[in-house]
A protein has these predicted regions:
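Gram-negative bacterial Sec-dependent N-terminal signal peptides
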Residues: 1-21
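Glycine-rich, small/hydroxylated-residue low-complexity segments
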Residues: 22-536
């Protein structure tokens, strides 16, 4: 629900077709309604059409699903001809947002309602109890202007918002009345969106930029119990040179995206979006008491350099890819005797998840990488005060891909409604049946040791008995073990056992005794061989 709601606010207060011919205020208003309907919104409002000026008061865009309901309300929207074949659109008053959604009830409530010991178990798991949560907010856009040109089938919306300010009230946790305020501003927001009618649906593209964006949370946090006594939170976040581009396509029929997302994707709905920014800076300051009534405090800051985020959604799956450079964080917590500080040259991640149920296997991908990870000396001195371990920047790479059968649409509303077992505890079942897994690379380089693993596995009827091979090379492991013993972190007798275990799975490389190699073979029937020797 968050994505359609956010898209609606942008599209409705921002906007999208090419400047080719006249458009009228009524046609622009109709285009906005059509665009919203394609994303599952119902539109109501009081219309006054004076020909060259159309006024809509109390325009409400509502998306009602089986378990949630969201609305965006515009007090007044004025559509006025400019005299040069275009229409000027202005939003007057504060835009109001309201979103109600259903979440699982707290586990304490589930335990209270669980059947007593010895009671007859139900024939089928009962649906878990749920509670409603509500988010409200307002958006202010003083000095806003949007100019629309083109034709009824191809409209271009060009907008400018000197300042966009938001003020939201968010629930803290299920079953609680406490809320926290979230405020923020976006300055220098400008861009365009184009809506083109196609095949009964609509193809949209957008491009926007903002000089700065900031968000703040300053709140009194509710107490978890009588002893804890609550606390305070001050969270600040700021970004510079924010930009976003993207395209989207809706099919020629309306869907309730809250409960019919799977059907919409199957019908051809797509979304492809990128977000970039130059810098991100943030800080936090928290204070409160723990369960023993002792005061606790924590302060910290974090920052990153240039970041690039991409998101894609279609019937082929959900795709996500992100890269962030020059990340760093520092924090001081009262329960720790030292500050925590670390930095990263780059962090990246990539994910592709199939979402549509089908008999044929579909591709997936999971990748994650940390490059140039360093820690402050205060952390190193805890376990290596004499600097015996190399403190060179560490790195980690995890790159997996494969194919899996999807047994249930991931956007099926039933996926979001947890089931419980006979004891009233939540139960879950994976919607994925893996067929292949390729370990493109798993690599670790830290404290003078390196590990690099590749391989491929295939899965049959029993996913716990794969067939395939994993190959690994390891460097500096023996030297690291020696240093851990010398530092007193691992007793000599325990290290002997670890060396014996390692000898079962790895052997020295020819001509390089400090390099180890390993070939782990998984065979039919669950047998496992390490370097030709059966270990299971």
């Amino acid at each position: 629900m968050v994505r359609p709601l956010a898209t609606s606010v942008l599209a409705l207060t921002l906007g999208a077709g090419s400047a080719l011919a006249d458009v009228t205020p009524a046609q622009v208003w109709q285009n906005l309604q059509d665009y919203s309907a394609d994303y599952g919104y119902q539109v109501t409002g009081t219309i006054e059409d004076a020909g060259n000026t159309l006024t809509v008061t109390d325009a409400v865009f509502t998306m009602a699903g089986e378990t949630d309901n969201s609305s965006v309300t515009f007090p007044k929207m004025t559509f006025q001809e400019t005299g040069d074949a275009r229409v000027r659109v202005v939003v007057e008053g504060d835009v109001a947002l309201n979103s109600r959604f259903t979440v699982p009830a707290p586990t304490e409530d589930l335990a209270e309602d669980a059947p007593e010991a010895g009671a007859e178990a139900p024939a089928e798991p009962a649906p878990a109890e749920t509670v409603d949560m509500t988010m409200t907010g307002t958006i202010k856009v003083p000095g806003n202007e949007m100019v629309v040109s083109g034709t009824p089938e191809d409209m271009l919306y060009e907008y400018s918002y000197p300042t966009l300010a938001f003020d939201f009230t968010l629930p803290t946790e299920p079953g609680q009345d406490a809320t926290i305020p979230v405020t923020g501003t976006v300055t220098g927001l400008a861009g365009s969106q184009r809506n083109v009618a196609s095949d009964g649906g609509m193809t949209s593209s957008f491009d926007l930029k903002a000089a700065q964006a900031a968000m703040q949370i300053v709140a009194q946090m509710p107490a978890e119990d009588a002893d804890a006594g609550g606390g305070t939170l001050d969270f600040q976040l700021a970004l510079t040179n924010l930009a976003s581009q993207g395209t989207g396509k809706t099919p020629g029929q309306a869907f309730d995206l809250g409960s019919q997302m799977a059907q919409a994707l199957a019908a051809g709905m797509t979304l492809d979006t990128t977000v970039t920014y130059d810098t991100l800076e943030g800080s936090f300051d928290v204070a409160g008491r723990d369960e023993n009534g002792q005061d606790q405090t924590g302060t910290g800051s974090f920052a990153t350099g240039a970041s690039d985020i991409a998101f894609q959604m279609s019937g082929g799956g959900l795709g996500y890819k992100a890269t962030t450079a020059d990340a760093k964080a520092e924090m001081t917590i009262s329960t720790l005797p030292f500050p925590i500080s670390y930095a990263l040259d780059q962090i990246s991640g990539e994910m592709l998840i199939p979402v549509t149920k089908g008999d044929a296997a579909q591709p997936f991908k999971l990748a994650y990488a940390l490059e140039g990870l360093t820690f402050a000396d205060a952390i190193w001195k805890l376990f290596d005060p004499t600097s015996q371990l190399p403190r060179d920047p560490a790195s980690l790479i995890v790159d997996l891909s494969g194919d899996a059968v999807v047994t249930q649409d991931l956007f099926d509303p039933a996926m979001g409604q947890p089931q419980t077992d006979a004891d009233g505890m939540p139960v879950s079942e994976s919607p994925f049946l893996p067929e292949t897994l390729t370990v493109n690379r798993i690599a670790l380089d830290a404290v003078g040791a390196k590990a690099d693993i590749t391989g491929a596995l295939e899965f049959g009827d029993n996913p716990n008995e794969p067939v395939g091979t994993l190959n690994g090379t390891f460097e500096g492991v023996n030297g690291l073990m020696d240093k851990l013993v010398a530092m007193g972190l691992v007793p000599q007798e325990q290290m002997m056992g670890m060396r014996m275990m390692m000898a079962m799975f790895a052997k020295p490389a020819e001509g390089n005794p400090d390099q180890l190699t390993s070939e782990i073979e998984f065979r039919e029937g669950g047998q496992i061989f390490a370097n030709g020797q059966q270990v299971k």
